[in-house]
């Protein structure tokens, strides 16, 4: 972000950061909750013991991420006695960069987990159990993909709108979409690919807060829809499998 348009660390921006992190924590917690239920049911299926071990590893990783998110305190960057107009006040970049890095880390992990959970594992379940008792519903897979896509786009927006982009903050799925568009000669202005939609830089704290609030509403809705589908599939697992006696 250019210095003449620098957003400073203020109580308002710190509150905004807390809201952003709360969304990420909720996203992580949703997976941790449903996967723990899934792992519990998989104990009953000896042929899926290796798949269960893989999911346990993913849950441990997500739990670690969530602990990191919950322990982050943006208010530590507020300089006592300084306001956002003070040239010595910390730039918002100092607070948002580690958050952007965490978002990138999390969505890249979700990319791997979602592929395993919605594709590879579904095939293994069908081939090893010969039934669909422990599979995901089609609706839950759609919700998983939709939520992931919007969290990727939010991460992209957070980075590019503040002009803090770096190849170390690039997201593979976005870079792949850009590469394919270049090779195909796609008109980015006419595509409906969410990853290719233009992101404009913000020039003030107020603008960033306004757009963040809009994103918060969108992601809140996506997470609510995801939780509903996770509840449906967890109920399915319980009705089909959870009532069996050990």
Swiss-Prot record:
GO terms for molecular function: lipid binding; mRNA binding; sequence-specific mRNA binding. Changing residue 63 to A/K: Prevents association with ASH1 and IST2 mRNAs and leads to their mislocalization. It comes from the Eukaryota. It is found in: Cytoplasm; Nucleus. Changing residue 130 to Y: Prevents tetramerization. RNA-binding protein that binds specific mRNAs including the ASH1 mRNA, coding for a repressor of the HO endonuclease. Part of the mRNA localization machinery that restricts accumulation of certain proteins to the bud and in the daughter cell. Recruits the MYO4-SHE3 complex to the ASH1 mRNA. Also recruits LOC1 and PUF6 to ASH1 mRNA, which are required for translational repression of this mRNA. Signal peptide: none annotated. It comes from Saccharomyces cerevisiae (strain ATCC 204508 / S288c) (Baker's yeast). GO terms for biological process: intracellular mRNA localization; mating type switching; mRNA transport. Homodimer and homotetramer. Interacts with LOC1, MYO4, PUF6, SHE3 and with RNA pol II subunits RPO21, SPT4 and SPT5. A motif (Nuclear localization signal) lies at residues 15-23. This is SWI5-dependent HO expression protein 2. Belongs to the SHE2 family. Changing residue 120 to Y: Prevents dimerization and RNA-binding. Its main location: cytoplasm. Changing residue 49 to K: Prevents association with ASH1 and mRNA and leads to its mislocalization.
């Amino acid at each position: 972000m250019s210095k003449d348009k620098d957003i400073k660390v203020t109580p308002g921006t710190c509150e905004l950061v807390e809201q952003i992190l709360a969304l990420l924590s909720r996203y992580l917690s949703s997976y941790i909750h449903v996967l723990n239920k899934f792992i519990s049911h998989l104990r009953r299926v000896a042929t899926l013991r290796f798949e269960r071990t893989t999911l346990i590893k993913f849950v441990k990783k997500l739990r670690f991420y969530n602990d990191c998110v919950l322990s982050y305190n943006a208010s530590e960057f507020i300089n006592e006695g300084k306001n956002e107009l003070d040239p010595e006040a910390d730039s918002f970049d100092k607070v948002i960069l580690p958050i952007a890095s965490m978002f990138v880390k999390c969505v890249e992990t979700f990319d791997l987990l979602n592929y395993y959970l919605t594709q590879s594992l579904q095939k293994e379940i069908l081939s090893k159990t010969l039934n669909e008792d422990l599979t995901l519903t089609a609706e839950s897979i759609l919700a998983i993909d939709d939520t992931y896509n919007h969290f990727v786009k939010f991460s992209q927006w957070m980075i590019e709108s503040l002009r803090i982009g770096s190849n170390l903050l690039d997201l593979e799925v976005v870079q792949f979409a850009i590469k394919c568009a270049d090779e195909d000669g796609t008109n980015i202005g006419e595509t409906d690919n969410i990853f290719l939609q233009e992101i404009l830089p913000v020039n003030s704290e107020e603008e960033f807060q306004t757009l963040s609030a809009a994103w918060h509403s969108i992601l809140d809705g996506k997470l609510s829809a995801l939780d509903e589908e996770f509840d449906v599939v967890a109920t399915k697992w319980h009705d089909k499998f959870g009532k069996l006696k050990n």
